[in-house]
Regions:
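A metal-dependent hydrolase metal-coordination microenvironment
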Residues: 30-238, 255, 265-269, 273, ...
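Active-site clefts of carbohydrate-active enzymes
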Residues: 246-260, 284-290, 294-295
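Catalytic pocket-lining loop regions of alpha/beta-barrel enzymes
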Residues: 214, 250-253, 334
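Acidic/polar low-complexity surface segments
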Residues: 242-243
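C-terminal functional module detector
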Residues: 25-51, 63, 102-108, 275-471
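C-terminal motif of bacterial Sec signal peptides marking the signal peptidase cleavage site
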Residues: 19-21
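Bacterial N-terminal signal peptides that target proteins for export
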Residues: 1-12
């Protein structure tokens, strides 16, 4: 988001560092914290579809406010150390696709191919017409990250295949558009029309835009005092005070990567608008937006890394599409458009074994698909477990909910809820059916050090799956 950076966190974090008390050296030490994420395929391959982990809403040195407000040098060259941090973070967190969404200042001023920031052995990906639509970076461990180009201003076009049409000034005007004409221009450029910061967008605007998808969660919204107060109905300063505790570098400090536990909460206005549009019969996938700029907390935390490092933010959560080839940007975009995706707050744990499907006779329906009403189907939710959970740690509590948004009334009903290992629900009435999982992350309590385990005793949103539809 361009309105303001998160730099106002710095003072709070510095104060916490100065005031933090020393820890108890006798406290039990938990197993080492994993600063990375596993290959997405460890979540489980189902019916020939592999999960591909993606970041949707990500800023590079081609956003004017990235990299502590210094994304380019005096000669216009990108901030190479900041770019290197981004590239290393994508490798450490095993991101399969990085949907860059830079602000029009300065993204609109550059040739499209320049925006991929290809370095070293990166390879271009072209379409049938020879246009570069993506690039691939191979990490030291052989993992491949696919980059695509988009923008984030009032709207958020993603996975463009070329710049929108017109002169440089016309590009700026279109990227800053917020009407149906802008949406049409994004699609004409081969992209998807997404909406970031759903919490602040009027429902009338969303109806008129008819976007391809929206954010159901945005990190910046959960932290910014103004957004919390004006749009989320949350205490404006609560997130800052709580998150500042994780800047402690004294013995007994909490694991810095768990700072998100201090402010993670549902973006309820975004969820309500999603339900409203689903109740009107729209098909609408959702993502969670990292909104990462590496421009907010330059002070080092106890792990020696700045508080808002790309690696830390990308470690917190991502979006998973189900595809036959995780390296194919066309397949990824098709899955995004179709709604074959779900979001995961991976700071709470990587879910292994999750499967959401509907079955009717020999036919299986995936997320985003339409089930004929006359046919009916059985929705099955196989609840996941937390990957690699050390037996010495407390056991988390995982709960799934099946939510029906009826069309055309818009009535929202919880059809089933439980801790598993499986839920089965018949889908017969028209509407959208979505699955949401929450977790009480008790296994993280020992990593909270002198803060104590209270933050790990709260029920937190873990997974939002895009709906299936009965029509």
């Amino acid at each position: 988001m361009r309105a303001r950076s998160l730099g106002w966190l710095i003072g709070s974090c510095a104060l916490a560092c100065a005031l933090a008390a020393c820890g108890d050296d006798a406290a039990r030490t938990p197993p080492p914290w994993d600063r990375t994420l596993p290959d997405a395929r460890e979540l489980g391959i189902r019916r020939g579809l592999s999960p591909a982990r993606g970041i949707v809403h990500l800023h590079s040195p081609y956003s004017h406010d990235a990299c502590d407000g210094r994304p380019r040098d005096a000669g216009g060259a990108p901030n190479e150390p900041c770019l290197a941090d981004l590239r290393a973070a994508l490798c450490a967190t095993h991101i399969d696709f990085a949907a860059l969404t830079d602000h029009d200042d300065t993204m609109a001023d550059e040739d499209f191919a320049t925006l991929f920031s290809m370095r070293g052995g990166d390879q271009p990906v072209t379409n049938g017409g020879g246009e570069q639509i993506a690039s691939r970076m191979t990490c030291e461990d052989g993992h491949v990250v696919t980059f695509t180009i988009g923008g984030e201003n009032s709207l958020m076009p993603i996975m463009l295949e070329r710049h929108v049409a017109g002169t440089v000034q016309a590009r700026h005007d279109t990227y800053n558009g917020e009407d149906a004409a802008a949406v049409a221009a994004f699609r004409a450029a081969g992209g998807l029309a997404w909406v970031a910061h759903t919490e602040s967008k009027p429902i009338e605007m969303l109806r008129a835009l008819q976007p391809d998808g929206i954010e159901v969660y945005n990190l910046h919204a959960n932290i910014d005092p103004d957004i919390r107060a004006d749009y989320l109905g949350l205490p404006p300063s609560g997130a800052l005070a709580a998150a500042a505790e994780f800047a402690d570098t004294n013995p007994g400090h909490p694991e810095p990567d768990l700072a998100m536990l201090a402010f993670l909460a549902p973006n309820q206005p975004a969820i309500t608008k999603w339900h409203t549009l689903l109740g009107e019969g729209r098909h609408l996938p959702v993502t969670a937006g990292s909104d990462a700029h590496q421009n907010a907390i330059p002070i080092p935390f106890a792990d020696g890394e700045r508080g808002d490092s790309y690696r830390r933010v990308l470690r917190w959560f991502g979006n998973f599409v189900l595809v036959t080839d995780p390296r194919d940007p066309v397949a990824v975009k098709q899955a995004m458009r179709a709604g074959r995706l779900f979001t995961v707050m991976e700071v709470l744990g990587t879910p292994v074994g999750l499967d959401i499907r509907a079955s009717s006779g020999a036919r299986t329906y995936e997320l985003g698909e339409v089930i004929p009403r006359a046919e009916g189907a059985m929705l099955t939710v196989e609840l996941p477990v937390v990957r690699g959970l050390d037996p010495r740690l407390p056991v988390p509590e995982i709960r799934a909910r099946v939510i029906w948004i009826e069309t055309p009334t818009g009535v929202v009903t919880e059809l089933a809820a439980g801790t598993g290992p499986r839920l089965d629900v018949f889908l017969g009435a028209p509407g959208a059916y979505r699955v949401e999982l929450s977790i009480v992350p008790r296994h993280l309590g020992p990593y909270l050090g002198d803060l104590g385990p209270a933050l790990a005793e709260a029920e937190l949103p873990w997974i939002y799956a895009s709906p299936l539809y009965v029509e």
